[in-house]
């Protein structure tokens, strides 16, 4: 199969490498290079959008760059889909589960969290693409490699320099597992629609701190609201059944990080 992977960030690199390792032909571009690459659209089986604005070092940064956040997370995926109309290429889009708050049930639910421009922008494209693309939702992605986009790396760093907040149970994503499942779904030509690529079960921050072997200080909810510019999504969403239990995946990732 022939793939066009858009977005040279953390997720895009993982998707690119995974597809190459499976023997596929892969063209890898940044979102700035899309117009030129799309001239060759008829030859791609899948266009995989991994581009997006997440904010650095965290989602608070999006509040101070609303225009680019909306363009990257809402406008760009919709325009990309429109460019694919009347071609043989199908669109796969990496989205976010941080469009929800609470315990979400059922195969599909409308976004219900609007506490940050990041979540709002992701929710817009999620709604538009739900029947038009394969939508891969991930949450708080982690891996066993110590790198800045790794959720576990962020937690380690926050525990050293600030405090943590435990707002309740969350679904999380082992990003390497998620990428593997995403590749499986595209190879299988699975139905278009949303796929929650989260590990089975959920975890709260106190339990995560115990797995990680850290003893952080904790924000009160009031302190956290004062310290942050954006609200945070706290939610559990149904999993696909294709990924490991979250506590098993986290323990494995933490063990690998301590070895490197």
Give the positions of each predicted feature.
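N-terminal Rossmann NAD(P)H-binding glycine-rich loop of SDR-like oxidoreductase domains
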Residues: 1-22
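Mid/C-terminal beta-alpha module of Rossmann-like enzyme folds, strongest
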Residues: 181-228, 254-258
């Amino acid at each position: 199969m022939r793939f066009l992977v858009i977005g040279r960030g953390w997720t895009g690199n993982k998707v690119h490498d995974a597809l190459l390792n499976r023997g596929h032909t892969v063209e890898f571009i940044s979102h700035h290079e899309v117009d030129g690459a799309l001239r060759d659209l008829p030859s791609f089986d899948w266009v995989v959008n991994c581009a997006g604005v997440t904010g650095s070092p965290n989602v608070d940064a999006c509040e101070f760059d609303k225009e680019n956040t909306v363009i990257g997370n809402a406008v760009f995926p919709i325009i990309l889909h429109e460019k694919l109309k009347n071609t043989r290429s199908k669109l796969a889009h990496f989205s976010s589960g941080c469009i929800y708050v609470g315990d979400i049930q059922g195969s599909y639910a409308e976004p219900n969290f609007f506490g940050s421009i990041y979540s709002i922008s992701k929710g817009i494209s999620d709604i538009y693409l739900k029947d038009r693309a394969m939508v891969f939702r991930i949450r708080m992605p982690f891996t066993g490699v110590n790198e800045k986009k790794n959720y576990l790396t962020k937690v380690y760093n926050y525990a050293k320099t600030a405090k943590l907040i435990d707002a309740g149970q969350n679904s999380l994503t082992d990003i390497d597992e998620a990428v593997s499942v995403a590749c499986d779904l595209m190879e299988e030509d699975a139905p278009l629609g949303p796929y929650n690529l989260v590990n089975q079960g959920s975890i709260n921050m106190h339990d995560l701190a115990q797995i990680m072997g850290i003893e952080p200080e904790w924000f009160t909810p009031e302190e956290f609201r004062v310290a942050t510019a954006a609200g945070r999504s706290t939610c559990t969403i149904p999993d696909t059944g294709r990924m490991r239990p979250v506590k098993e995946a986290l323990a494995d990732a933490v063990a690998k990080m301590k070895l490197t």
